[in-house]
Amino acid sequence: IEPKVGKVITGLGVGEHLAYWGYPADKLIELDWQENATLADGFMVTALPARHFSGRGLKRNQSLWSSFMLTTPSKNVYVGGDSGYATFYADIAKRFNTIDLAILENGQYSDNWADIHTLPSQLPQTIKTLNPKQVVTVHNSKFVLANHAWDEPLEKIAESAKNNDINLKTPMIGEIFYLDDPNQTFKAWWR
């Protein structure tokens, strides 16, 4: 995939792994929280906080976990990354004012992991705080790390969306999603 990639923007310390896998240094941009990278045609990526950890075993926390805001000439797209619930969402909402799409973690959670994975009971508050025009949830329906049913994350957020005026989009993996069509609907494919 590397030949098809223009730039890789990531948190501090992740670039060394990509370089090991053959990515040239001139394609790698590492950012600390609150730093941004300006790209061509008015695009900018800002690294923002997330609440997680990095690494496994004895080599933990040697790289930075992040969320990102992609700012285009006409849209703000927030990619929440792998994160537990935290108060920094209010700071992000204040800084960016309008968020057109929030892509948020929703799955592979446990009460024991609440600091690093958003719980279903916390997700509506995250969405309310960020106040995005549209929401897509990720980190679900692909692999199992937790003890909940594979479809539980989607069931819970779909129910919550109905009760909390959330413009939730649930495209099937690979299905086309049109950011400029807030009325686009998707079937509940997981049922």
State where each predicted segment sits.
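Alpha-helix C-terminal capping segments
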Residues: I1-K4, L70-T71, A161
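Cap/insert and terminal regions of metallo-dependent hydrolase folds
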Residues: K7-A19, A86-I173
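Residue-level signal for beta-strand positions within conserved beta-sheet cores that form or flank
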Residues: P24, D41, N164-I166
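Core dinuclear metal-dependent hydrolase active-site scaffold
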Residues: L31-N97, I173-R191
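Short low-complexity, flexible loop/linker segments enriched in glycine and/or proline
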Residues: P24-D26, M44, W150-E152, Q184-F186
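Active-site HxH/HxHxD metal-binding segment of metal-dependent hydrolases
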Residues: I1-T38, T46-R56
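Structured loop/turn residues at beta-strand edges in well-structured enzyme cores
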Residues: P3, D26, F43, S63, ...
